[in-house]
Amino acid sequence: MYEYCSVIIKKYSRYTIPSLAPKGFSSVLEPPHIDKWQHLSVNCTLQFKVLLEDSGQVALQVILNNSTFLEHIRLPLGSNHDSIQFSCKCPIISCKYISEEFGPKVLKRFQINLSNEMDFNRIVISLKNLSFIVKTAKTSIARNTMINQTSDFSNSKKGNFNENNNAGTYRNSSVQFQTQNMVMDFSQIYQEKCARELNNCSNITFPMTNLPMTQQNFPTPEANVEHFSQDLNTPSATQTIPIAPEPLSVKLLEASPPLSNKSRHSPTTKKENRNTAISFDLLSKKGAILHNGNDTLNVADLPKKRQSTEDLVQIRSSANVVTTLGTSCNLVKKNATKQNKEKVDNKLSDSQNVAHTNEYQKKKEIPLCGPINGLETKMTLIQEEMMAAKKTSRDPPRKISKRLIKEKLKDEEFMKWVNKVERVLSKMFEK
């Protein structure tokens, strides 16, 4: 094995997704995507080698740290036009080749970036000597897109004003302008073209009308952005300009009074309300002057005050309606809860109520011996009734518990009442 050429590489790039190519290079393929490239250039030593084997084959290798093979291609010498192709533009060499390792034909790509022009020329000459196809990268697409972009930019700048002969020299120079490295980002090329335009177009006469000049921000050449394509052509750059969202306009809607209030009020009541509102305004106005003889009023801005008072009356009426509705709802809820509690309490305290009623009836049936005794008995009865009412109102509703059931079972009057109820129910069922 003979080492024909060996060069240190500055950067190695590989396309991660191989493309199916059943017809080889003549098959229809999708253009490579920029996001699918992997790069290797930092904290490592990369080397590209061209080796000649004794069997008459050529081996192309990309070696990492003198140990691992990133690329290892073996081809027959002289008859390799249908299996591998190279395209170059200093200092980059791109390679695409057909591989059949896993069955179907697959197209793979990789690129190497060299540190200087001498190494670049060495590899190109050695590949051509070994009868490899080495093409120069086409720059027509990048140049045409660049000229179109710069012409659109100059047309938008011109507007309605005239240019001098410097613009003509700029057009001629734009055709002849070429960059050394065509793999660099299109935005950098565009930035250099704009700088030339500003230097050449120095004598431009502006009209009287003030044209709005927009300021464009271009990326700095220090940005590490790279674009790859099949023939080392730079794709057209597209710039998206974010649009600021419009501020939202929020309008507050005034609450209109309900229709029920309008239907309830009669025309006479409306007139009375208006009269009261006007009289209130007249009293509150400091500049009001009353003449007793003619009964005339000299008040400034009286219609404006009337409108404001009517609005206030409507708003207050609507607020009162809302508050009355809220209070009525709360009262209904409270009454419902009270009724439920009273039903439960009535079931538990029927015996107590019967006992209290019997005691009150006995006290009412006491004969009166005289006027003083009668008054005293009446006062005591009234006081006892008041105290009983207070107790019933203060006592919280009792809950059915084991303790309460035990107390009721010990109560003789309650048990007698239960026995009476059982007798009555048994008689009703017998009938």
Swiss-Prot record:
Its main location: nucleus. It is found in: Chromosome. The keyword Ligase does not apply. One of its GO terms (cellular component) is chromosome. Keywords: Chromosome, Meiosis. GO terms for biological process: reciprocal meiotic recombination. It holds the Pfam family Meiotic_rec114. The keyword Calcium does not apply. Required for meiotic recombination events; not required for mitosis. Belongs to the REC114 family. This is Meiotic recombination protein REC114. It comes from Saccharomyces pastorianus (Lager yeast). The lineage of its organism: Eukaryota, Fungi, Dikarya, Ascomycota, Saccharomycotina.
